[in-house]
From Swiss-Prot:
May function as activator of the canonical Wnt signaling pathway, in association with DVL3, upstream of CTNNB1/beta-catenin. Positively regulates Toll-like receptor (TLR) signaling in response to agonist probably by competing with the negative FLII regulator for MYD88-binding. Belongs to the LRRFIP family. The modification Phosphoserine is found at S18, S77, S80, S88, S92, S96, S100, S101. Residues 73-102 have a biased composition (Polar residues). This is Leucine-rich repeat flightless-interacting protein 2. Keywords: Coiled coil, Phosphoprotein, Wnt signaling pathway. Residues 53-68 have a biased composition (Basic and acidic residues). Gene3D superfamilies: 1.20.5.4090. One of its GO terms (biological process) is Wnt signaling pathway. Residues 29-71, 106-202, 245-393 form a coiled coil. The modification Phosphothreonine is found at T99. It comes from the Eukaryota.
Length: 400
């Protein structure tokens, strides 16, 4: 990832988890408060029900006592009346039977009361245990409902995270595809540059760096600005000395002007010499007798003049050829400079665009990777909490 960017500021995962834990803690506290209120209401209802049962039990006890008293007072009166009869032989047996009948109901009544008290105790214990089981059942049902709600919320969050993860994965794939396309374009540009170098080498051209455009030595040098010329033009430019291409071209143009001025001067001198020679030829017949002694000097002067004229003609022709060659080289160089400068500017623009697109893609890739890492951490945290809730639910169901 290398190049630092100004990516967006992420929300710490710890803060988000603490906010979720606080929300869950608030939900748990509210649930416990509602559960405590329900327990208090159930305890009050249970006390009222127990008092009502005790009242009903007392009424039943009083009714049963009255019934037993009525049932056993009537036989005792009949037995006392029969005991006053004059039958002496059966009186002892009847008295013994009456006493046994009076004793047996008392014992059965005490046993019934004891059994009734035991049944009441068992009933009370059963009612208390039933109330406790009812409370525990309601508590467990409430906890199960709460856990179901939490699980549903977690499942919705997980589904949302999965959707976001899928969208980010698709976005990442698109960014990778764009990176591959840009890489392919970059490879094509590199291949074009390689073919250009091969063509330059094939045609025997020479690459000359253009250090300062427009000849301004105070301007920053343009990165990647080059010029391709032939070897002859390169030799001519090397003869112009060191420096930027524009400066050397101006030097060559100045030398051209100097040569042209020299040629014009030589032409003027040649015309003057021709006029002098023609004047000398016209006066040579008249002065033949006077200048017999100076013939050798005239011949020598004519030879020197002819030699100078031939030299000047040769220099003139050579200068004209050099001027023509330089003009052709300058025009060709100007065309090549314009063409390659345009190509270099286009290449620089494409390179800048590719670099900007690459930096943008790298920033987006880092952002996407950070989001994916954050979602993976959130997913693992939620998965752990979900497993913990499932374990608690399983334990509660096992206890139930």
């Amino acid at each position: 990832m290398g190049t630092p960017g100004s990516g967006r500021k992420r929300t710490p995962v710890k803060d988000r988890f603490s906010a979720e834990d606080e929300a869950l803690s608030n939900i748990d506290r509210e649930a416990e408060a509602r559960l405590a209120a329900k327990r208090a209401a159930r305890a009050e209802a249970r006390d009222i029900r127990m008092r009502e049962l005790e009242r009903q039990q007392k009424e039943l006890d009083e009714k049963s006592d009255k019934q037993y008293a009525e049932n056993y007072t009537r036989p005792s009166s009949r037995n006392s009346a029969s005991a006053t009869t004059p039958l002496s032989g059966n009186s002892s047996r009847r008295v013994s039977g009456d006493t046994s009948s009076l004793i047996d109901p008392d014992t059965s009544l005490s046993e019934l009361r004891e059994s009734l008290s035991e049944v009441e105790e068992k009933y009370k214990k059963a009612m208390v245990s039933n109330a406790q089981l009812d409370n525990e059942k309601n508590n467990l049902i409430y906890q199960v409902d709460t856990l179901k709600d939490v699980i549903e919320e977690q499942e919705e969050q997980m589904a949302e995270f999965y959707r976001e993860n899928e969208e980010k994965s698709k976005e990442l794939e698109r960014q990778k595809h764009m990176c591959s396309v840009l890489q392919h374009k970059m490879d094509e540009l590199k291949e074009g540059l390689r073919q250009r170098d091969e063509l330059i080498e094939k045609h025997g051209l020479v690459i000359i760096p253009d250090g300062t455009p427009n000849g301004d030595v105070h301007q920053e040098p343009a990165v990647g600005a080059i010029t391709v010329v032939s070897q002859e033009a390169a030799q001519v430019l090397e003869s112009a000395g060191e420096g930027p291409l524009d400066v050397r071209l101006r030097k060559l143009a100045g030398e051209k002007e100097e040569l042209l001025s020299q040629i014009r001067k030589l032409k003027l001198q040649l015309e003057e010499e021709r006029q002098k020679c023609s004047g000398r030829d016209g006066t040579a017949g008249d002065l033949a007798e006077l200048q017999n002694g100076s013939d050798l000097q005239l011949i020598e002067m004519q030879r020197d003049a002819n030699r100078q004229i031939s030299e000047y003609k040769f220099k003139l022709s050579k200068a004209e050829q050099d001027i023509t060659t330089l003009e052709q080289s300058i025009s060709r160089l100007e065309g090549q400079v314009l063409r390659y400068r345009t190509a270099a500017e286009n290449a620089e623009k494409v390179e800048d665009e590719l670099k900007a697109e690459k930096r943008k893609l790298q920033r987006e890739l880092r952002t996407a990777l950070d989001k994916i890492e954050e979602m993976e951490m959130t997913n693992s945290h939620l998965a752990k909490r979900l497993e913990k809730m499932k374990a608690n639910r399983t334990a509660l169901l096992a206890q139930q």
